[in-house]
A protein has these predicted regions:
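PLP-dependent enzyme catalytic core of the Aspartate aminotransferase-like
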Residues: 1, 338-369
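N-terminal "arm"/small-domain region of PLP-dependent enzymes with the aminotransferase-like
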Residues: 1-34
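Active-site C-terminal subdomain of aminotransferase-like
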Residues: 15-16, 194-280
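Conserved N-terminal alpha-helix of the aminotransferase class I/II PLP-enzyme fold
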Residues: 23-73, 92, 96-100
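Conserved PLP-anchoring active-site segment centered on the Schiff-base-forming lysine
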Residues: 79-95
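Conserved active-site segment immediately N-terminal to the catalytic lysine
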Residues: 182-194
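Conserved PLP-binding catalytic core of the aspartate aminotransferase-like
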Residues: 289-320
Length: 369
């Protein structure tokens, strides 16, 4: 089968291999069969390995949904009664956690920092000291809206010193840059299959401390479908999801994980890094600037400032690139006009070099006409 290859420079879903795409073409199977349950058990264990977890302590719980379902699940499931959430917020995707808290009516503090900077650890420390009822601290590892990489190891240490559970959204970092759930002081991390693993959309997962999941059994029940303990318990008792899983998507995730381990994480990390460097090289050649300090960037997403040109039109540039096989994406900084270029997915330096050849021509054809 000849599948046209598209280069996705958006922050997910990412460009995938044909073998992952074709892994979805399998004989029909009832997801309650032991064969399928066995595959999901191995998948869960392998996801823990991706996060460098300890299988005697950590587990992975699968859910059907986009990555945002994980935020919903962790916040509504892991907060005890009469306790509070602290959201360490320096970006648009972290703000989703604030919105989840608002929708559930969860007591919370939205600790806002500039989207251009790292969170101030001393302010986090003081906030926890002043609010002993905070039981859960939440932030994002890689804030995809800007490309900034947050100091989760340091934040986790502070959270634990105050007896709080530390939950981190690793949707746009897990499997692409170094992460160790234990060494990074993280109790729960989360991701979706279509980003770092380069699988298909529709399957998400939470990796975390089993003892903390079991403790949450007696917490207030705020959701039926999106309850972490309920899904975990059903997996432990039956090997199955509580409700119908995305069967073909699970097969694609299995193939993607096989490819992840075959390549090896160090080689995969190195590829993402050289793609990121190629993006910066291309931006420099075009004279385009980025919004976040280079030393704070994740190595995966670059927020690019619009050029100082009244003729610049992002929509036209997007469409021009899209017609030539490349997808670029709008920025998420409300105060500044930006677009994003990402080093996610099954792409390499040659793809980026071809993209910037297109960008050089778009400057001539669209911007300067």
């Amino acid at each position: 089968m000849n599948i046209e290859r598209k280069i996705l420079l958006n922050p997910g879903p990412a460009t995938t291999t044909d073998t992952v795409k074709l892994a979805q073409v399998v004989p029909d199977i009832c997801p309650r069969e032991k064969e399928f349950a066995g595959m999901m058990k191995q998948l869960r264990d392998d996801l823990v390995r991706v996060a460098h977890g300890d299988l005697s302590k950590h587990t992975a719980v699968l859910f059907c949904g986009s990555g945002t379902i994980n935020i919903d699940i962790c916040l509504n499931s892991l907060l005890p009664a009469d306790k509070k959430v602290l959201v360490v917020n320096n970006g648009a995707y972290i703000t989703r956690a604030v919105e989840v808290c608002e929708y559930y009516g969860l007591p919370h503090i939205d600790l806002k920092f500039s989207v251009y900077e790292l969170p101030d650890l001393s302010v986090i420390e003081k906030t926890l000291s002043d609010n002993p009822d905070i039981a859960l601290v939440y932030t994002t590892h890689h804030e995809t809206g800007t490309g900034i990489l947050n100091p989760i190891r340091e934040i986790g240490k502070i959270a634990h010193s105050h007896g709080a559970v530390f939950v981190v959204d690793t949707t746009s970092s897990l499997g692409m840059i170094p992460f160790d759930i234990g060494k990074d002081n993280v109790d729960f991390c989360m991701a979706s299959a279509q980003k770092g693993l380069q699988a298909m959309t529709g399957l998400s997962f939470i990796i975390g401390d089993e003892s903390l999941i079991r403790a949450s059994r007696d917490y207030p029940k705020r959701s039926y479908y999106c309850n972490l303990y309920l899904q975990y318990d059903y997996f432990e008792k039956t090997g199955e999801m509580h409700f119908t899983p995305p069967v073909q998507t699970v097969y694609a995730a299995r193939q993607a994980l096989d490819e992840y381990f075959a390549v090896g994480e160090e080689a995969k990390f190195a590829r993402h890094k050289r793609v990121f460097e190629a993006i910066h090289k291309g931006l420099q050649e075009l004279g385009l600037q980025y919004a976040i300090k280079r030393e704070w960037q994740s190595g995966l997403v670059v927020s690019v400032l619009y050029p100082d040109d009244p003729l610049w039109d992002f929509d036209k540039v997007h469409d021009y690139c899209y017609e030539r096989g490349f997808t670029i994406y709008p920025g998420k900084i409300s105060t500044t006009n930006t677009f994003r270029l990402c080093a996610l997915g099954e792409i390499d330096v040659e793809d980026i070099e071809r993209f910037f050849e297109v960008m050089k021509s778009v400057n001539t054809v669209l911007v300067n006409k």
